[in-house]
A protein has these predicted regions:
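Single conserved hydrophobic/aromatic residue that forms the stacking wall/gate
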Residues: 1-11
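Active-site donor-nucleotide binding/catalytic segment of nucleotide-sugar enzymes
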Residues: 9-53
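Alpha-helical structural signal in soluble globular domains
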Residues: 32-39, 58, 62-66, 142, ...
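Short acidic active-site motifs
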Residues: 55, 88, 92, 157
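Donor nucleotide-activated moiety binding/catalytic core segment of transferases
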Residues: 71-117
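Catalytic binding pocket for nucleotide-activated donors in carbohydrate/polymer assembly enzymes
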Residues: 98-181
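C-terminal alpha-helical cap of glycosyltransferases
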Residues: 186-204
Length: 204
């Protein structure tokens, strides 16, 4: 698989993912990764998948500012030398969601309207989401009210939510199960179909 080739040994390790992030929230996410790394909570690997992969090298510079070593997904650098892998290709998100212990969905800590929760939910990754989700308001509200995703409003809450899911297997399982129940209940519904359509339309 593409992911196993690009992530090597990390393919078999726990992945902490931030997906579809935008320029204005990258520093928030990277600083959250730094805080978690300093706590030494887990033996996994941080993965950052920006909404626009062409920004990957800019994200490496931000990592350096925070004292974190990073590598691009397409780079064969050893994982022993890096803290974060930055995804700079398309076509690997399904595999990432399957491997992720927990996923923050970007575009939601800033006023971009969020992104589709259905994919990470389908693959069983517990979901964290920011407050700015007006593009997907109905489905996000259902996820939050059904305890199928955790709402985070800032960096501190993001760190706390990542930590909670990493440390609490019951919480992780509950979030994943509740999200899958929503998808099962809504299968074929207009809301689910519109979620995919809106994510394509607002891919900016």
């Amino acid at each position: 698989r593409l992911l196993s080739r690009g992530l090597g040994d990390v393919y078999k390790r726990q992945v902490i993912l931030a997906a579809s992030t935008h320029k204005e929230e990258d520093e928030i996410v990277i600083e959250a990764f730094k805080d978690l790394k300093q706590e030494k909570l887990f033996q996994g690997h941080f993965v950052l998948a920006p909404r626009h992969p062409e920004r990957a090298k800019d994200l490496q510079n931000i990592c350096l500012r925070f004292g974190l070593n990073s590598r691009l997904y397409t780079n064969k650098q050893s994982f022993d030398d890096v803290d974060i892998t930055i995804i700079n290709v398309i076509g690997v998100m399904d595999d990432l969601f399957q491997r992720s212990r927990v996923t923050f969905m970007g575009g939601s800590l800033i006023k971009r309207g969020g992104h589709n929760l259905i994919e990470p939910a389908y693959f069983g990754s517990p979901i964290l989401i920011g407050p700015h989700t007006f593009n997907f308001e109905e489905i996000v509200d259902e996820f939050i009210s059904s305890d199928a995703a955790l709402l985070v409003r800032n960096k501190i809450e993001l760190v706390n939510a990542y930590r909670d899911v990493i440390q609490d297997e019951n919480l992780a399982t509950s979030l994943s199960s509740n999200a899958k129940n929503i998808i099962k209940k809504r299968r074929g519904s207009t809301v689910i179909q519109l979620s995919y359509i809106m994510d394509i339309i607002r891919n900016k």
